[in-house]
Amino acid sequence: MKTGRHNIGDDTYFFATSGERQTINRRALVLGETSTRAVPIEDVNAMEKVFNNQDFSEVVRFPDKTKSEIIAKMEELFKSSNESDVNYLYLTCHGGEDGTIAIGSDGQTFSGWELASLLKQYKGKFVVMLDCCYSGTIIDVGKPDKKVASKSEERFDEQAFLAGFSTGDVASKNGEMLDSKFLVLCASWKGEKSYSLVGVGSLATRYWAMGTGWDPLQNRMISPMADTNTNGKITLEKLYQYSYPLVLEDASQIHEEQHVSVYPKNSQFVLFQK
């Protein structure tokens, strides 16, 4: 059998050169820049619960940290990763129309190119779940010229907020995570904002959590809503198919559009298990 990951039934295994099956260690880093009302700490709370409800080797909650602190934490958590491992990175924050990810509490951002380059230093597969405006830029999904007006519920000047961030001289382009190393869920298309509701949290994060079996509103475990065939496996495609119509519907209630996006399409890679 060839080296690498192989699906056997509903499970994914990693085979080394010797042909022996190896254990897949999973670890998660939960990030959030929650200094403004539009990015609620409840997002971080929900995804921390999601990961802690799984049999992961390590889950690290790390919100409201500087860019340098985040980079150091990535090194600490992911440096021991093997090729057989799966690493999860969740980010909730503001995002710019140019694809910048405003995750640093010190006013520093990551470009998609910079984030992808950092993660490529480490062995293993990366599952990236990004809940921010224009997040689909990192996988080049959506309408690039779509302009979405700021909604009154945000109650702050988002462009002025983002103007305070600096990405330095790092080059940026679309589709930085279109790479076999990554499995990616984005809260919106590259031409759209990502919305949150008071008392609910961010729309995409809410349904990603519920899809895996955690209700962030009731703060309790539930049956995994994305497990449509009840086999106890939540694949990337299942979570995408579950969250996409619900986020779109909820956004329409505030007269906006928000399309969850995914890479790669139709992936049967198992992200979570019951």
Go through each PLM region and give its residues:
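Cysteine endopeptidase catalytic domains of the caspase/legumain-like
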Residues: 23-274
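Extracellular adhesion/carbohydrate-binding repeat motifs centered on closely spaced tryptophans
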Residues: 1-22
